Structure formats: structure tokens, C-alpha cells
Amino acid sequence: MILVDTSVWIDFLEGKGSPQHHKLRMLIENDEDVCLTGIVVTEILQGIRDERQNREIRDYLLEFPIFNPQGMSSYIRAAEIYRTCAGKGKTIRKTIDCLIAAVAIENGLVLFHNDRDFVNIQACCGLKTFSL
């Protein structure tokens, strides 16, 4: 199953025509197993000011499977990811990316992203990813 990060969803929803936008559209059209985490839903919806558009996008996103942190162990794993990367000289800009990575690792998901934090996490912590 492919966990799609906020960076890719935003390109897709804004119709930017990026390689990530086209790949996600292809995955969805081919009924591939695409999923989100609640954190990604939050990041997407917080930036949509128009109420009607917010509701439409929310309803669309909620059609996909949602994976969430598995309790305190996910938050501890996120901290471990951050510390491991820092110990290897890799800077993680957003702590939330460590939590998204923890959810992906715990659930055996492959993360589709366009965010350098995940490149660093993959190098340090065995996160399975693909990006374009």
C-alpha cells in the first residue's frame, strides 16, 4: 500500500501538472492501494480557505484508507527517527514528518513524497519510499 504525503497531494489537488501529480492520478485511476494518514489530511485541509472546497476535498480524501499513529509507541518511534537522523548528521526540518514516517514504518507502507526530509529519514531509518 502507498501512503501519499501532503507534498504530493497538494500538487495533485492543485493540478500543478508535476510528475508527482501525474503519478498519483495514474495510481488512483488504476485503483492502486493509495492511503493517507490523519496528519496528512490535517495538513491538506488547514490550507483550504473556501468552506465548500474544504468540504469537497475532505469528503474525497476520506474515501481512501486512513492510517493513524498507534498510540504512544508511534510518537516514541518518531522521536527515535529524529534522533537517529540527527546523530547521522541529517537535519529533519519538520517533526511531523518523523511521525508520518513512523506510521509508514509501523504499517509496512511505502511513502510517496516530494520532500527532502523523507530522503534523510530513508537514509537513516529504513523508511520505504518512492519519489520522482
Where are these regions (language model features)?
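Short, hinge-like loop/turn segments at secondary-structure boundaries
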Residues: 51-55, 85-86, 128-132
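Generic structural signal for small/hydrophobic residues in well-ordered secondary structure
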Residues: 5-6, 44, 78, 104
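Short, well-structured N-terminal submotif of metal-dependent ribonuclease cores
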Residues: 1-36, 46-59
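Active-site neighborhoods of divalent-metal-dependent phosphate/nucleic-acid chemistry enzymes
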Residues: 66-112
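Short beta-strand scaffold positions
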Residues: 4, 36, 69, 112-113
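A generic structural signal for short hydrophobic patches within well-formed alpha-helices
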Residues: 9-10, 41-44, 118
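Acidic, PIN/NYN-like endoribonuclease modules and their adjacent C-terminal/linker elements
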Residues: 1, 101, 105-132
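A general structural signal for well-ordered alpha-helical segments in protein cores
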Residues: 21, 41, 54, 75-79, ...
